[in-house]
Amino acid sequence: MESSSRIFVKNLPPTITEAEFRKHFSAEGRQVTDVKLIPARHIGFVGYKSAEDAARAVKYFNRSFIRMSRISVDIAKPIADSKPQHKSPSKGSSKDADPKNAPKVLPPNTKVTAAAVPKVEAAPDAPKRKLDVLDEADPKLQEYLDVMGAHPSKKMRNAEGLPTTVDEVLAPAVPAGLEDGESDDEYEDIPSRTHNQSHTADQEMVDAPLAASAEPSESAPPVSLDATDDDWLRSRTNRLLDLVDPEDAAFALRPAASGSAAVSVPSTSVENTASAKPEEHPAEDSREMAATSTHDPESAISLIEKTSRLFLRNLSYTVTEDDVREHFAKFGILVEVHVPLDSKGHSKGFAMIRYEKPASALAAFQTDGTVFQGRIVHILPAAAKRENKLDEFALSKLPLKKQQLLRKKAEAASSTFNWNSLFMSQDAVNTAMAERLGVSKAELLDPTDASAAVKQAVAETTVIQEAKQYFAANGVNIEAFKTQQRGDTTILVKNIKNTTIEELRTLFEEHGTVLRVLMPPSGTIAIVQFAQPVQCRTAFARKAYSRFKDSVLFLEKGPKGLFTDNVAVPTDARPAGVQKPSVADLLERDDAEEQLETSSLFVRNLNFSTTSQGLTDAFKHLDGFVQAKVKTKTDPKKPGQVLSMGFGFVAFRTKDQAQAALKVMDGQVLDAHKISVKASHRGLDAAEERRREDMAKKAANQGTKLVVKNLPFEVTKKEVRTLFSAYGKLVALRIPKKFNQSSRGFAFAEFSTAKEALNAFNSLKDTHILGRRLVIDFAQAEDIDPEDQIAAMEKKTRAQVNKVALQQLTGTGRAKVTIGDNDEDEV
């Protein structure tokens, strides 16, 4: 059974309030996502962020005291779980426990008829009496009635409307409020449920939503006197909470996944959250919530197969898009995750998700009623997303330039392709360099100069290097620009001229909270970080290709993991300046010890008895300590309990503090185990791992020769020499030619030292010349050892011999075959 993030509490004080209940189970910084309290039954439910938090809460609060009551805490059982077996009755009560002798309990609002009343069998020797038929002509009966009618209280009985005659006594009861002659068809006879009728948990799951949605005012069925607290709770519990609207009842008419949801009760009070706030559904979100045109599970499944979208309700108000994506990504690839936020940036308690394949959406739909972050999530099919597609007929009437602009703006939000995140337009680079040199762009770009392309390339290289240094000084991970994954909170803003940071902040704050805006002194590129992904997407869609001052904004989604720290820079803080390196710093190779790329540490070889609290106690004395956590898994033999996996993670504020902690704690003994501390590295995709392996090989075999690819065919050898000689002394430069003496599109540049080659590689790897981005790499080292050359020649010769032998074997299959005798004598 999958561990739940909800706990069940029994034996609560009868006068405890909801605020006290929440405060008690939020002790020691525990994050409570849901609270359901039933003071009359002394029970309650508490939801936590994760199953590990719930397991720790059970271990901490079980058999503890609230006031003078010792509470019992356990993991909440699933909805589809079978009812617990009652304790075996004693011998004295064996007769009463017999189902045949047990009294039948009729459902409420049941009209009792003579046929429904069970007949009591008399003893064999008892005299038989006729009680069903009374003879009103019997003189003794009339005498008895007359005598009884002479009693002084007869008038009082008549005044009160009490029955005084046999007809009145035996007359059937008429419901109050009905006059003679009125129809009482609305009062239906409800047949009593027989005890030998068996119902599975799945059938109860189907019947409960119908009863809850069709007759909400109907009282719960009575429970026998010997019922336990669990039986009483189940009789009062709606299987799917009060989340099912009448129009959405059809979507809930199916059993939830077995063993994956916790028992709860319908909430009749205000939502129990730390930031209690109603679910405000804006018009644009309510239109896309759930489809209400279908009323049966088959229609719901067919709708999911068409749209692959789901609507999630009853989510925690602290849930994020990453939490929803991580929880539902196990069913398939998620294309879209949308969690609406209120004006304060908090979740509204519902979300929309869309899968790549309908089968994945159907698998996720089957988890309706399961527990997610301590709350029972309700899943409904969602209608297709409304997209404002461009009308080709109306678009054709616009000018061509306007058509292209509208198409670019429509494709900007969904396009993830970009060939170089640090690419800057030549006009912006030339403007920045002209302002720095104090000249006009016409003077900078001399038409009589043959090396104008080289000047632009050098200017772009200078601006890019300054931007990299500025971003690195302000907490930006420069290596993140090489990744293909796009983030959801950052935007790269380009094509900006004569713009300040305050103007950019004012421009983007119209769509949400801006955490920080970074723009290098050149003013050619800027990074804008938002607090919420929804705000970032809105700003990107509104501002892409929009006019700002005298130019058009070019926006790109920032790469994932762009910032090395998650601490937001205050709005009034000024970015740090750029420290310009000296010539000696550029020529010196950094041989210092490799620094950590993360502020988290990986701790292995932990004792299985070591808990997160024990790991915290071992590291909390170190400077910059944030948190420590031991990785756990669910115990298959003991549901609801967790087991340590023997390793954990420790987070620090900065990389330097993590580096110092690694040196101090590596090799220390914790709970009789010598722990091993290393830097924590996140899993990379195959492309990134292959890229890092290639870089490691290149770093190990760095030489003095560079290969320059994607070279424009129009560029000359003189221009290439001018470009590379600015970063070191060139020993040789070779541009291979075709038979017509034109360039083949690549070149080889050899420097005098490896340091100069490395400086040229780092400086020119993002440079463009004549509109082409230079792809620079270290050339493969030449074999100097004669033995290596001989071995390579032998290998090449063996390959040629094997190829010839293979051709001989496969070529004989086409030999001509003669059938019959062609040398027949002529007649």
Swiss-Prot record:
<feature type="region of interest" description="Disordered">
    <location>
        <begin position="176"/>
        <end position="230"/>
    </location>
</feature>
<feature type="compositionally biased region" description="Low complexity">
    <location>
        <begin position="256"/>
        <end position="270"/>
    </location>
</feature>
<keyword id="KW-0677">Repeat</keyword>
<dbReference type="GO" id="GO:0000480">
    <property type="term" value="P:endonucleolytic cleavage in 5'-ETS of tricistronic rRNA transcript (SSU-rRNA, 5.8S rRNA, LSU-rRNA)"/>
</dbReference>
<feature type="domain" description="RRM 3">
    <location>
        <begin position="489"/>
        <end position="560"/>
    </location>
</feature>
<feature type="domain" description="RRM 4">
    <location>
        <begin position="599"/>
        <end position="682"/>
    </location>
</feature>
<feature type="compositionally biased region" description="Low complexity">
    <location>
        <begin position="208"/>
        <end position="225"/>
    </location>
</feature>
<dbReference type="GO" id="GO:0042134">
    <property type="term" value="F:rRNA primary transcript binding"/>
</dbReference>
<dbReference type="GO" id="GO:0034462">
    <property type="term" value="P:small-subunit processome assembly"/>
</dbReference>
<dbReference type="GO" id="GO:0000472">
    <property type="term" value="P:endonucleolytic cleavage to generate mature 5'-end of SSU-rRNA from (SSU-rRNA, 5.8S rRNA, LSU-rRNA)"/>
</dbReference>
<dbReference type="GO" id="GO:0032040">
    <property type="term" value="C:small-subunit processome"/>
</dbReference>
<dbReference type="GO" id="GO:0030686">
    <property type="term" value="C:90S preribosome"/>
</dbReference>
<feature type="domain" description="RRM 1">
    <location>
        <begin position="5"/>
        <end position="78"/>
    </location>
</feature>
<feature type="compositionally biased region" description="Basic and acidic residues">
    <location>
        <begin position="277"/>
        <end position="288"/>
    </location>
</feature>
<feature type="domain" description="RRM 2">
    <location>
        <begin position="308"/>
        <end position="384"/>
    </location>
</feature>
<feature type="domain" description="RRM 5">
    <location>
        <begin position="704"/>
        <end position="781"/>
    </location>
</feature>
<keyword id="KW-0698">rRNA processing</keyword>
<keyword id="KW-0687">Ribonucleoprotein</keyword>
<keyword id="KW-0694">RNA-binding</keyword>
<dbReference type="InterPro" id="IPR012677">
    <property type="entry name" value="Nucleotide-bd_a/b_plait_sf"/>
</dbReference>
<feature type="compositionally biased region" description="Acidic residues">
    <location>
        <begin position="179"/>
        <end position="189"/>
    </location>
</feature>
<dbReference type="InterPro" id="IPR035979">
    <property type="entry name" value="RBD_domain_sf"/>
</dbReference>
<dbReference type="GO" id="GO:0000447">
    <property type="term" value="P:endonucleolytic cleavage in ITS1 to separate SSU-rRNA from 5.8S rRNA and LSU-rRNA from tricistronic rRNA transcript (SSU-rRNA, 5.8S rRNA, LSU-rRNA)"/>
</dbReference>
<dbReference type="GO" id="GO:0016607">
    <property type="term" value="C:nuclear speck"/>
</dbReference>
<dbReference type="Pfam" id="PF00076">
    <property type="entry name" value="RRM_1"/>
</dbReference>
<feature type="region of interest" description="Disordered">
    <location>
        <begin position="256"/>
        <end position="299"/>
    </location>
</feature>
<dbReference type="GO" id="GO:0005730">
    <property type="term" value="C:nucleolus"/>
</dbReference>
<dbReference type="InterPro" id="IPR000504">
    <property type="entry name" value="RRM_dom"/>
</dbReference>
<feature type="region of interest" description="Disordered">
    <location>
        <begin position="77"/>
        <end position="116"/>
    </location>
</feature>
<comment type="function">
    <text>Involved in pre-rRNA processing.</text>
</comment>
<dbReference type="InterPro" id="IPR034482">
    <property type="entry name" value="Mrd1_RRM3"/>
</dbReference>
<dbReference type="GO" id="GO:0003723">
    <property type="term" value="F:RNA binding"/>
</dbReference>
<comment type="similarity">
    <text>Belongs to the RRM MRD1 family.</text>
</comment>
<protein>
    <recommendedName>
        <fullName>Multiple RNA-binding domain-containing protein 1</fullName>
    </recommendedName>
</protein>
<dbReference type="InterPro" id="IPR051945">
    <property type="entry name" value="RRM_MRD1_RNA_proc_ribogen"/>
</dbReference>
<keyword id="KW-0539">Nucleus</keyword>
